[in-house]
Amino acid sequence: AERLDENSPEALALNYKHDGASVDHPSHAAGQKCINCLLYTDPSATEWGGCAVFPNKLVNANGWCTAYVARG
């Protein structure tokens, strides 16, 4: 799989960013990032991993989008 492009239509639709710390969005809270999201399919992937929202794409472990769901 290839890395998700922040400027792709699907990424833009969900306000996806590779660096969650730089996100300026009303839904974003500190500490939220792909690696601790329920939709991140491989929590052991610490740099880039799969996401249920973006099939066949890799998202950054420190990324964020509006589909974020806290794990656990």
Curated annotation (Swiss-Prot):
Family matches, as InterPro entries: High_potential_FeS_prot, HIPIP_sf
Keyword list, A-Z: 4Fe-4S, Electron transport, Iron, Iron-sulfur, Metal-binding, Transport
Coiled coil residues, start to end: none
Listed Gene3D superfamilies: High potential iron-sulphur protein
Entry protein name: High-potential iron-sulfur protein isozyme 1
Functional note: Specific class of high-redox-potential 4Fe-4S ferredoxins. Functions in anaerobic electron transport in most purple and in some other photosynthetic bacteria and in at least one genus (Paracoccus) of halophilic, denitrifying bacteria.
Positions with a binding annotation for [4Fe-4S] cluster: 34, 37, 51, 65
GO biological process terms on file: aerobic electron transport chain
Classification via SUPFAM superfamilies: HIPIP (high potential iron protein) (SSF57652)
Entry GO MF terms: 4 iron, 4 sulfur cluster binding; electron transfer activity; metal ion binding
Quaternary organization: Homodimer.
Assigned protein family: Belongs to the high-potential iron-sulfur protein (HiPIP) family.
UniProt keyword Cytoplasm, yes or no: no
Organism: Ectothiorhodospira shaposhnikovii (Ectothiorhodospira vacuolata)
